Amino acid sequence: MLVGIDEAGRGPVLGPLVIGICCVPDDAEPLLTSKGVKDSKDLSPKKRQEIEAWFHQQPTEDGWFGTTVSIDPETIDFALQDQGLNWLEVDGFREAMMHLPHRKHLRIVADACDVNAQRFTERITEGVSGWPWKGSEMVSEHKADEHHPVVSMASILAKEERDRAMQAMSERVGIQLGSGYPADPTTKTSLEHLILQSGIDEQVRWGWATVKRFWKEHRTGDLPVRGVQRTIQQQLFHEDESRIS
């Protein structure tokens, strides 16, 4: 069986980081290619949705499997305060692997999230329960989603799950959010509604440079920090703001 793992949403200031994993029969990659599977960034939203729906219709008894692991902004912020984003992704890739229904005779290809692809593999596998799995091997490659259809499929699953999370957030706050990436004009505009003097929305990555810069330019006082209780003055300000609204 072939397994692909990839992520979506490492760089955005809004929403989760999502890791996708999929498993297909050894001879299925030509079929994936024929269905238009390629790096999710090169596909329209409509095409990604069509491919995702098709994938989930494939017979699980033949080994087809796919799922995602979502890492919320709070967890991302705490990771930035600790070991960093690379280790967070290592943990996420491990978690994704543990969802696989079969753990033998697998060739696993991951899109490397570390400048050292071999190190990325080693960090993942050293924490995977029971590794090495019988008859299995794992490699990590840079731009694997461009060269391995099974990894491209994983990227599509991850991207679609992240898009759903962003849509849910947009509906909750009542504004358009764009892609969530700092360079997106719609995302930039949305920050005015998400980063308030009284607090920052939980689906914003508080530790991102974009947030720090916005706070410095448009808000006063110290930037809130995840896990640090706000001051009495901030709490009173929030209460006053609530009464005004």
Regions found by a protein language model. Name each.
Residues 1-245:
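RNase H-like, Mg2+-dependent phosphodiesterase core
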